[in-house]
């Protein structure tokens, strides 16, 4: 069954800028677009022609219930262990402080365990290593700005003595800058160097470029003192060993943290959070000449997955963009991302870490596939936080997109999200039971009980309205003309049990869409053999009919063959052996007869042969059987002696589908003697073979032999029998197979295949065997059918992994190996 995502018009994420042109990436498919928190919009976009998957998050800083925070891994400097972004998100979510989204941030030194530039967390400079190339700052009044950072920080005693602070915290090994160092409450080192130590405790919150922070002096010592969650340590040595000579316990000391103007930009007052931006990529609405093109080793042209940040001209809207590097998403350079951001509202753009560090996390789950081989813990991150009070009361429903743009007479599953009064998400993929849907105008289409939108026949604009418990959600809709409307198959075989939706397709600019057969008026040349309702066929009695569907001037046709199903049907009882072709690569005495049947067998036949030594040894029964109707399984009874068991390596059935091409070759390996039944279901891991592939034909049964020479091998056979469903829900016979709905194939590339038995979504996660989640993918709501997900094995380190999938109200776990 062919299934296709519907393409939607991209809704831009801010005020358009006319100073930059977005890269020519083709049509944008907006997969998701909704608020994930107060004033925090989340958008997932797909550019199929690149191909590229991009996430854009927009923060309205005027909303009183959101903040942006810089956080150090494990709240430690240095931190050689580092921390996954999703773990930062979980760790720092508390009542009234809900992390809605998180991103990786700065480049870092593995050996030193520190970021490479100046960062500020809640008003405290964590590490000014080299200060860096640019700073993306957020002030106390929630205004963003970008500038070149030049620190000027001091400690001032009560008597007016002062000393310049050269550095904040130290790295793990060799970073030992400055003779005056302020070790903050993020310090993770055990301080042991010679010098003077002054332990201080702040009386108020910290701020940069604001009122200096007054602290109490707790201890003064020539021996090392240690920091804590509440206490900082000012360390003096060498040229500054005797600075602040009169400082005493019980006095106050003032810490002034300032950033002054450098080569570009003006540092604002009252900075609470700041992020090192490495080179400034775009500044004041255009690429920042002398900065973006002064990236070491030409890294501005390096293609990779990446995270970048931007702000609007007034600093009141902030943007974060992340991309994926995977089998389905190519690497992009920072210039293209910056131009895309400029074209969609950004004024200034800076570059965060890229490659394997890139991470976007929503609801504590990493959405992008890890680049460069595996999950990478990072040194710091960006948190988008809701500070709204906890509230689980549903006040809003939203659709997962802000605009639906689909062809006429198409089918589009709808997804609803519930939010509280602050716009914090309560539930994604809300159950649609209890919702009332309507379309305005009515000619726009209709929504069925499974929340699938059936687009009308006329090109128009309107909206879908969903309502439950007096709460409504609206989705603007535009429909478009579609070309080349046709049925995917010219002829179809159906039974009297399973309904079949006519597979109607059309395309727009080469993109194929699933269309709604219920939009057509259908006539049948033989209505007694099957009926059709809303484009769905149901067989009644054996026969053939020609269906004609009409919509205005469009006409489509389909030949339908109905074969009513019995419960079972014996296709071969071996009563007539007059036309039974046999073949062998290693036997000249091959025969089949009714002689010497096993005791208790009323019928059947015995295959007999001698085996001589030879390559590729096998014996083959070449009689062909066109299987009646749509069986769900097939069986063959046989009886094996010790000699036959030793001779047989495996038994293979060769099936072809209706077009005569090789289709399926299941193998059975016998393990015991005596009566036994080979049984196979016409399915793959519980998923019935597509109706379009029937009828199936069993072309041959091959007994593949173990090498050697043997004489008088006999294999009794009886009843090649097909089994049929007796009701639609029993299309697969559970006697013969497990009730799975997903499976992995490894022919060339690792792929997950899964079957949706009803309209819905699939939640797919990849885990290490140690229980660490690597990635999560949640599909859009899709129509019933079989879908494929490409497993990103080439981006994973060698080893065993576990894939979990939730769909159809069930969970299934599968293992796979990366070599």
Protein language model features and the residues they cover:
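Gly/Ser/Thr/Pro-rich low-complexity, intrinsically disordered segments
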Residues: 21-525, 529-568, 701
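Residue-level detector of functionally pivotal "anchor" positions at catalytic/ligand-binding pockets or at interdomain
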Residues: 392, 723-747, 757
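Extracellular carbohydrate-recognition regions
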Residues: 563-589
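Short carbohydrate-recognition loop motifs
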Residues: 593-617
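Extracellular ligand-binding interfaces
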Residues: 611-690, 710-716, 726
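Glycine-centered tight-turn motifs at strand-turn-strand junctions
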Residues: 674, 773-796, 809-810
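C-terminal tail/sorting-segment detector
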Residues: 733-736, 776, 798-819
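Short, glycine-anchored, charge-dense loop/turn motifs used at functional sites
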Residues: 767-774, 801
